Amino acid sequence: MLLPIVVLVGLPGAGKSTIGRRLARALNTELVDSDELIERATGKACGAVFSELGEPAFRELEAIHVAEALKSSGVVSLGGGSVLTESTRELLKGQDVVWIDVPVEEGIRRTANERSRPVLQAADPAEHYRNLVKVRTPLYEEVATYRLRTNNRSPQQVVAAVLHHLEID
């Protein structure tokens, strides 16, 4: 069975999709984004699907598409909350999983005005984001083989760090 070259995880706004696209280009391979698989399957934006189904049903649907994405031999980018599902965490065992770890204040800044992410909709978005950090950090720690802190790094520097981790530089 083929395994992805690398799987990217991290909070909303961490830059998984941006880094994934650039990394796939650098490796001359495909990017499979689990959020895009959901959007293709439903014909709707992920945020709309999340709002319509509610989080538990969305996570079930997401787990199906994560399993599909992990059959790729390229770069895989997972939705920020995908690690909440135990079956996804099990599937990530044995994979090279890079946690794109964005500083909390940067993540808040990047997602503050995004209406397309219902998981972040709250009376106090900054406090809600901090709560996501608290809940998800132990799960990212569980699945990640490499934690890449993006502090003050450009996307090019993050890609270079992932390539170095993969010993492809």
From Swiss-Prot:
Primary localisation category: cytoplasm
Residues the entry annotates as binding substrate = 35, 59, 80, 136
Which EC number(s) does the record attach to this protein? 2.7.1.71
What is the UniProt remark on how the cofactor binds and its stoichiometry? Binds 1 Mg(2+) ion per subunit.
The record's Pfam families line, in alphabetical order, gives: SKI
Residues where ATP binds: 13-18, 117, 153
Return one Gene Ontology term, BP aspect. aromatic amino acid family biosynthetic process
| GO CC, one annotated term | cytosol
What Gene Ontology molecular function terms does this protein carry?
ATP binding; magnesium ion binding; shikimate kinase activity
Protein family according to the UniProt entry: Belongs to the shikimate kinase family.
Q: What is this protein called?
A: Shikimate kinase
Query: Can you name the source organism?
Result: Corynebacterium glutamicum (strain ATCC 13032 / DSM 20300 / JCM 1318 / BCRC 11384 / CCUG 27702 / LMG 3730 / NBRC 12168 / NCIMB 10025 / NRRL B-2784 / 534)
Q: What is the lineage of its organism?
A: Bacteria, Bacillati, Actinomycetota, Actinomycetes, Mycobacteriales
